[in-house]
């Protein structure tokens, strides 16, 4: 009987040890579509491959639902890492503090918000003033800023998007969007609509400027990759600084900042932090 109990104990310890070795940790990341649709998933895949070579299995749950979701996910502790293409708002910071959350924003890349039109459009450049006129609804026909005619279809992000707020501030002088502007869920949807509409105009992150059927307009003579480009912003990881990140989540953020991670940032047409 003693032998059987000893054998059972050995088997139990062995099974528990194997279970510990093979346990897969899942890193939950939520927020900005600008970060979460292409860039962060590609960084995550590279990180997984690196960890696998070290015998560590890691999985990711990435939800690209807008910057507001990213901020809320850190406040509500539904994600270990948030993603945002804008600074947290004062009311969000206040809500975080009320819940004991010390919101930390880590710049992991930079992005220019590109103005795109259909490739058949004759317009070759645009000014900040003209952008404001179009997206505020003051100009609704191309004849208002060019020699061509046609009713303008202006495509924007939805209100939960950080890009929506940043563009409103930097591209529209903080004016309200026009009532006829069409709100889209993500960059990909805006690019697709503009590609299919000869009178379309919209704004997207740099990862989407090579969408077939669209072209990028210089703004006041500068392209989105230029240091002088007027509609540019940092892209953030968010975390709760009052809590210690899991070792793997911390390593993932470090990997994102490493030369290998920043090479991926550049590869998907965003701008590295150095």
Identify the residue ranges that each predicted region occupies.
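Bacterial N-terminal signal peptides
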Residues: 9-17
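Bacterial N-terminal signal peptides that target proteins for export
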Residues: 1-8
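Exported/periplasmic ABC-transporter solute-binding proteins
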Residues: 23-274
């Amino acid at each position: 009987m003693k032998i059987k109990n000893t054998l059972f104990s050995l088997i139990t310890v062995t099974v528990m040890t194997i279970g510990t070795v093979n346990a897969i940790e899942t890193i939950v990341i939520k927020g900005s579509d600008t970060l979460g649709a292409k860039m962060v998933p590609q960084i995550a895949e590279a990180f997984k491959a690196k960890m696998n070579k070290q015998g560590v299995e890691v999985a990711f749950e990435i939800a690209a639902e807008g910057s507001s979701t990213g901020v809320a996910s850190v406040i509500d502790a539904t994600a270990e890492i948030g993603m945002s293409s804008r600074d947290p708002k004062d009311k969000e910071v206040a809500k975080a503090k009320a819940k004991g959350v010390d919101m930390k924003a880590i710049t992991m890349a930079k992005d220019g918000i590109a103005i795109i039109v259909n490739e058949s459009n004759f317009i070759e450049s645009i000014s900040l003033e003209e952008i404001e006129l179009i997206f505020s609804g003051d100009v609704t026909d191309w004849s208002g800023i060019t020699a061509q005619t046609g009713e303008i279809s202006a495509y924007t992000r939805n209100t939960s998007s950080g890009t929506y707020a940043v563009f409103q501030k930097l591209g529209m002088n903080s004016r309200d969007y026009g009532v006829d502007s069409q709100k889209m869920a993500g960059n990909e949807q805006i690019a697709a609509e503009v590609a299919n509409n000869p009178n379309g105009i919209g704004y997207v992150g740099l990862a989407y400027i090579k969408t077939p059927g669209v072209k990028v307009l210089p703004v006041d003579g500068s392209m989105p990759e230029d240091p002088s480009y007027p509609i540019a912003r940092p892209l953030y990881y968010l975390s709760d600084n009052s809590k210690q990140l899991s070792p793997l989540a911390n390593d993932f953020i470090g990997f994102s900042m490493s030369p290998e991670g920043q090479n991926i940032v550049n590869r998907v047409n965003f701008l590295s932090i150095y």
